[in-house]
Amino acid sequence: MLEGTLQDCWTSISKMQLHWTVLGLLPVLFIAILGPRVRQIWVNYVHLTKIPSPHKKDYFCFVTETTRAEFLNECARLLRKGFASGDVIRLHASWDHIVVLSPSYAECLRADEKFSPDTFSDKEMFGAVPGFEPYRFLCTHRDLVRNVISMRLNRCFVPATRYLSEAIDDALRKQMGNDSEWREVPLGNAVLKILTQSSFRALQGPELCYDDEWLDIATQYIVTSVTGVTALRKLPKFLVPLIHWFHPDAIKSRRLLSRARAKLIPFYEKRKKELYQARRNGTYRPEDADAFGWYEELADGRDYDPVVAQLTVAVAATHSTTDFMCQFLSDMVRYPEYIQPLRDELILALKEKGWKASTILQLPLLDSVMKESQRLKPVAMGFMRSIAQHDVYLQDAVKIPKNASVIVSAHSMRDATVYENPDSFDGYRFINPTKHPESRHFTSVSVNHMGFGFGKHACPGRFFVNLETKILIAHLLLKYDWKFANDGCPAIRTSGFDQVVDPSAKMLVRRRKEEIRIEALYE
């Protein structure tokens, strides 16, 4: 018995020795596995900090909010200060250090595979946070999203011209009314609901486009998730993985995503069966389908979340477009001398050519006025957002380390060497093809007008947005008058690079007697 007891004791001691040996090896394993990664992070940080920064000196920026608050609240000033002395600067954003390049580098980046836009939105929009999955979907399924937009959505213009108009007409009646007396409306909320309904008509068909419950879920998700992202940017990055579990906007986003899932899954299953039968019978036509079918078709068996996919396109199609429309409406109140010429151009085109996509898309003055509105107040101060996939050396020997966040400043949109009187609104600026031939159309992109991005970073949905916003503007020009409420011109809210019209702004609208009825022109 004693022998057995000693043997058990020795076995226990041996196990303890083994455990201590393993514990002793842990630091070695830690250094071996994580050491190179930690070293690379440090090396990248050293190279990044060599790039000049316009921030105030703050040696405790890791634990204080000085530089982060400066970026969020004073980004425009930082950009002016930084580019006054160089073409490459570094800003301390809320989520990372960002290398900001002068517009002169846009041509170099437009097709450079060393810079990838895939993971930038995931990092900037906190795609890893539960409830914000649509922002990660843009990263993980970027090719699928681009194909759905460029190969399907952008090719449905002929039928879309009528059904978008019908959806917009219905939404306008609900949001702005038919009263000839002035009526106060919440500008951002009204425009968002109008554009959500019209976009969903193209993306999800008539059933969901006129479903008030679904429209409410979707618009709430867009507003709540964007608000949540903006709020989380104000926090130190290391706190986000914890705080989001308790943040009200993140919690609400998760609940809305669950409601969206319950609402959309039955429609997805139905469309999936219809697609299977149509392809089996050889009767499938992409132009007769919607985004449920397009995703399923182009995914070609690849795994994806159909609900997140729908919300991804919804956010992409409506958030920045809503801001543009709010700015356009504000500009038309500030510069009312363009209203009647725009109406005259539209009425003449409709009388001569009827209600067709080609008619709506060929309105030179409207293109120019929209382009000018976007030039003076784009949705962001920088575009072509990307992540360096390798160490990159710029022409002036500046090193951008691998995994660094990179963005191109859009300050050339107000450059006096490019535009005459750059701070003045000139609605006829782009109508002259000899002055700015590369920017005649609202959808055209260039180094000096990156309202939709540039190169491979350009927004693939801008052609659909062009049609949709012009249809909405046509209805507004013919059917409504609008002016500022007592609060006056809506303020511009900034958060880092983003600059949007105050979503709480109010506007007064009233119905007018149109010179020509759009509905009478439908073919």
Curated annotation (Swiss-Prot):
Pathway the protein acts in: Mycotoxin biosynthesis
Q: Which GO terms describe its molecular function?
A: heme binding; iron ion binding; monooxygenase activity; oxidoreductase activity, acting on paired donors, with incorporation or reduction of molecular oxygen
EC number per UniProt: 1.-.-.-
Q: Which sites carry carbohydrate?
A: N178, N281, N403
EC primary class: oxidoreductase
What topology does the record note for this protein and the membrane?
Single-pass membrane protein
Q: Is Heme there in the keyword field?
A: yes
List the keywords (alphabetical): Glycoprotein, Heme, Iron, Membrane, Metal-binding, Monooxygenase, Oxidoreductase, Transmembrane, Transmembrane helix
Q: Where in the cell is it found?
A: Membrane
Residues engaged in binding heme: C459
Any single GO CC term annotated in Swiss-Prot or TrEMBL for this entry: membrane
Residues spanning the membrane: 16-36
An example Pfam family from this entry, by short name, is: p450
What is its cofactor? heme
Per the record, the GO terms for biological process are:
secondary metabolic process
Q: Does the keyword Lyase apply?
A: no
Q: Which PANTHER family match?
A: CYTOCHROME P450 (PTHR46206), CYTOCHROME P450 MONOOXYGENASE AUSG-RELATED (PTHR46206:SF2)
Similarity section? Belongs to the cytochrome P450 family.
Q: What does this protein do?
A: Cytochrome P450 monooxygenase; part of the gene cluster that mediates the biosynthesis of the diterpene glucoside brassicicene C. In the first step of the brassicicene C biosynthesis, the bifunctional diterpene synthase bsc8 that possesses both prenyl transferase and terpene cyclase activity, converts isopentenyl diphosphate and dimethylallyl diphosphate into geranylgeranyl diphosphate (GGDP) that is further converted into fusicocca-2,10(14)-diene, the first precursor for brassicicene C.
Q: What is this protein called?
A: Cytochrome P450 monooxygenase bsc5
Which species is this record about?
Alternaria brassicicola
